[in-house]
A protein has these predicted regions:
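Hydrophobic beta-strand segments
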Residues: 38-41, 66, 102, 133, ...
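Conserved "repeat-terminator" motif of extracellular CCP/Sushi domains
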Residues: 87-105
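Short Pro-Gly-centered beta-turn/loop motif in secreted/extracellular proteins
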Residues: 32-35, 56-63
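Short, acidic Ser/Thr/Gly-rich low-complexity loop/linker segments typical of extracellular
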Residues: 45-54
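Structural motif
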Residues: 19-36
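Structured extracytoplasmic
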Residues: 103-268, 276-282, 350-454, 458-464, ...
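A short, solvent-exposed loop/turn motif at the edges and junctions
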Residues: 42, 65-78
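Exposed, low-structure sequence patches enriched in small/polar residues
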Residues: 236-239, 374-376, 380-827
Length: 827
């Protein structure tokens, strides 16, 4: 009997081994992007991976290999292991294959073409003239406690001198204890979406953010994911992507018809899409396409890169309208291949690099962000009266203080015990650490102010340096709403230790209209200004600890200005500025302007100025504190017109100036970004040198390269010397591409950018200007270079080289090496 039992045991063991099921996934070796529909061969059986590169096999002999093949890769043989983990097969790209792109067959191309052509009748936002619905959205940042080790780790670190340092790290233990009790962060909102023939608008009915009595307005305007699957560009994490069902997208993606299935009683095609270049981190996913109407009935998207993103859209079929209407959106963000710190929503979720600590996985790397959005109370056909259609989102104060009973109606998961504890815990933490006040303070500092009682102190006025004034010490500010919401008083005073002169300015203002933020101001100032500087009065103000360009400037002029100013945002996408001013000007260098046979070493100019900034692609939110820009989209356009007043007392010259600027920035999900800055100006009439164009030079007139090492500017020409060129009309173009940080170890992680700048200009009536020798930009000016920013503690290096018709005779005179400095204020 014992022998029989032994034989049965051996037989069953062999049988179970023979039936071992292994789950696996095929990925790219370098990018970790899954390889969809790779060919799997095991024991003469052949099948394909699914659209996420996953597969299952029943292994009978672990000594026999699994063969994997896919176009553009070397064939891979790999032996499965029975360890309960996912069996990963890493494919290596065959660089000898000239064309690694994959292509769609004609049938699926025809289906996608019909989807594109039928958008107008299938996209609810286009097919329905009038509708409204409410939407509940819940955002959560959390982690699975079971995925985190609770052990206290011993970490060995080596400093820059090679010495070892051992320390205990309890961060994983503390993180596990935190997420066992509550989520890391959460926020939720209920909004009303209305649409008529002309526009769509969102009104927030209720909102709450853990740790805040009043929500952070900027978050409520974030567009982390497109509402519509038909939208082009399709947006993920505020990054525009070409939609795979757009006209351009059809040229960038390849499609595969998997099969057809029944979905809500209708035949649908399941179609997989991926980039033609299979290693690209562009969008890929699975579309369910109605076989009759060619509408999207379900969509699943994936992105694999510095973050891994999953997005799922589900729809309900409305039979009476022959339309698929959104049912739910789910969005998941996890850490991807990035080994640098990655921040999402400011500092709220932060994935840390584990390269220094040499541990398998940081606890924070287990964190994930989820968003779930559910429409309800759909009403079709009724005309929707939309107030203020130019405002994209309305945020009334009544939405802030909804009680727990209100939110209980939307609770989807009664088993989530951590949700309520998260609000209680973070509200207490926020109160204890004054987080809400710190956010308020951070916004002020970001704009260059720090609040002190009824005053907002202007941080830009405290200390400056330039070659003319030396150190400039001062104090300035503006009264805030604690004193009055209708009136404000701006002021500053400063003293230059090198020129031994006092400068000052005062600007009282009155609010004419709160809704349009229309202010009327009077201003008087006695100060100095940079020679031939071009500034746009509608540019937004952001705090910079220092402005590097003026440090090396020696040519200034004294200007006493009395002005009346009107500023308004009557149209949300258009900022307007109008002023009439009288200016007394005295150049503080050797200069004479010759006009109509008369020599001027000082002069008066009376003028009007109209400045416009148009942001046609941005969206705006109406908040209790006013209208704010929420979706800062490009391009943006600035236009400025200046006209002197010949018949006004105190005006010596007649001239006009027109200035234009546009900026366009393209972010990529890889973390890289590209930007274009185009700027131009033209001046007509008798224009003194103080009001011509110098095109922002930033190179000092010294012989040796090392003597010219100073701080680099933001958009300045680094190899152009001060006062080298002046123009009465010019154009300039700047192209820039910024790459991801490169981790070199020891906390050294430079962010590289390649930059090319060029400018052309002309000057007429050159003989009117005496005292300064300068050249014309008629033949053009060209420079290119590399920026290695944020190498260590915000410090970096830049190197630029000057070439083209205005190249100088000696090599080192064309070369510019500068120090860059960036401060991360954390918001």
């Amino acid at each position: 009997m014992k022998h029989i039992l032994l034989l049965v045991t051996i037989f069953l063991s062999n049988f179970l081994v023979a039936q071992t099921k292994i789950n696996g996934q095929v990925i790219d070796f370098d990018t970790t992007i899954p390889v969809a529909f790779a060919k799997i061969t095991y024991e003469s059986k052949t099948f394909m991976t699914d659209w996420e590169g996953k597969f299952s096999i029943t292994v009978s002999d672990f000594k026999k290999p699994v063969y994997v093949a896919y176009k553009g890769y070397y064939e891979k043989s790999s032996y499965p292991v029975n360890n309960g983990k996912l069996f990963i097969v890493k494919m290596i790209m065959n660089i000898n294959v000239k064309n690694n792109e994959v292509y769609s067959d004609q049938k699926i191309n025809l289906i996608i073409k019909k989807v594109y052509e039928a958008q107008s009748k299938n996209d609810p936002e286009k097919a329905l003239t009038n509708f409204q619905y409410k939407n509940y959205e819940y955002l959560q940042i959390s982690a699975n406690p079971d995925s985190i080790s609770g052990k206290i780790d011993t970490i060995q670190k080596r400093n820059i001198f090679g010495k070892h340092k051992i320390k205990l790290d309890s961060s994983n233990y503390r993180f596990k204890k935190l997420v066992e009790k509550n989520h890391i962060y959460q926020t939720e909102k209920v909004n009303l979406i209305q649409q008529n023939k002309k526009t769509q608008k969102e009104t927030i009915l209720g909102t709450r953010m853990a740790g805040f009595k009043e929500p952070v307005y900027e978050y409520l305007g974030l567009k982390l994911l497109s509402y519509s699957v038909y939208e082009n560009p399709f947006e993920i994490l505020e990054t525009p992507l070409q939609n795979p069902i757009s006209n351009i997208g059809r040229k960038l993606y390849v499609y595969k018809l998997i099969d057809s299935v029944q979905h809500q009683g209708r035949k649908t095609y399941r179609v997989y899409f991926q980039p033609k270049k299979i290693r690209s981190n562009r969008l890929r996913g699975l579309l369910h396409i109605d076989a009759e109407s060619f509408a999207i009935s379900k969509a699943q998207y994936r992105i694999y890169g510095i973050v891994n993103i999953e997005a799922t859209y589900t729809f309900d079929y409305l039979k009476e309208h022959n339309l698929w209407f959104p049912k739910k959106r789910k969005f998941l963000v996890k850490k991807g291949t990035n080994n640098q710190d990655l921040k999402i929503l400011g500092n709220t979720i932060k994935f840390n690099s584990s390269s220094e600590e040499k541990i398998n996985k940081n606890a924070s790397d287990r964190a994930y962000l989820t968003i779930e959005s559910t429409p309800f109370d759909l009403k079709l056909g009724d005309y929707q009266q939309i107030n203020d259609p130019k405002i994209k989102i309305d945020l009334p104060r009544s939405s802030f203080n909804k009680d727990e009973k209100y939110w209980a109606e939307f609770a989807k998961d009664s088993l989530d015990k951590r949700k309520l504890k998260t609000y209680v815990s973070l509200d207490s933490l926020s109160t204890a650490n004054k987080i809400e006040h710190k956010v308020f303070l951070g916004k002020k500092i970001f704009n260059g102010y720090i609040p002190v009682s009824i005053l907002d102190i202007d941080l830009r006025t405290l200390i400056k340096y330039n070659n003319y004034e030396g150190f400039r010490i001062g104090l300035g500010g503006v009264t805030n709403s604690k004193l009055s919401e209708k009136y404000k008083l701006g002021f500053y005073g400063a003293y230059g230790f090198k020129d031994a002169e006092f400068k000052y300015g005062i600007t009282p203002s009155y609010l004419l209209n709160k809704k349009s933020e229309t202010w009327i101001s009077a201003s008087y100032s006695d100060d100095v200004s940079e020679l031939a500087q071009t500034s746009f009065v509608t540019d937004s103000r952001k705090f910079r600890l220092y402005d590097p360009r003026p440090i090396n400037i020696s040519t200034f002029y004294n200007i006493k200005t009395a002005a009346l100013i009107l500023e308004s945002k009557v149209f949300p996408k258009l900022n307007t500025y109008f002023s009439i001013s009288q200016n007394e000007i005295q150049p503080l260098f050797d200069y004479t302007f010759v006009n109509d046979g008369k020599n001027y070493t000082e002069y008066s100019i009376s003028s009007v100025l109209l400045g416009l900034q148009w942001n046609p692609f941005s969206n705006y939110m109406n908040t209790p504190l006013g209208v704010i820009e929420i979706e800062k989209r490009h391009p943006k356009f600035s236009l400025q017109y200046t006209q002197t007043l010949p018949d006004v007392i105190g005006n010596d010259f007649t001239f006009s100036k027109i200035d234009f600027k546009t900026f366009y920035e393209v972010p990529y999900l890889s973390g890289q970004k590209s930007s274009i800055l185009f700027q131009g100006g033209i001046a007509f009439g008798d224009v003194p040198l103080t009001h011509l164009y110098s095109v922002a030079p930033n190179n000092i007139n010294k012989d040796a390269i090392l003597q010219r090492i100073t701080f680099s500017g933001k958009n300045s020409f680094e190899t152009m010397y001060y006062n080298e060129f002046f123009s009465n009309k010019y154009t300039s173009l700047q192209l820039k591409h910024t790459f991801n940080k490169i981790d070199l170890g020891y906390k050294i992680a430079p962010e590289f950018s390649i930059v090319t700048r060029m400018a052309w200009g002309e000057i007429n009536k050159e003989n009117q200007h005496l005292g300064l020798a300068f050249k014309s930009l008629e033949r053009g000016f060209f420079e290119s270079g590399i920026e290695a920013n944020k190498i260590f503690k915000g410090l970096g290096l830049t190197a630029f080289y000057r070439y083209g018709p205005n190249q100088l005779a000696h090599f080192d005179d064309n070369l510019s090496i500068k120090i860059s400095y960036f401060i991360d204020l954390g918001f």
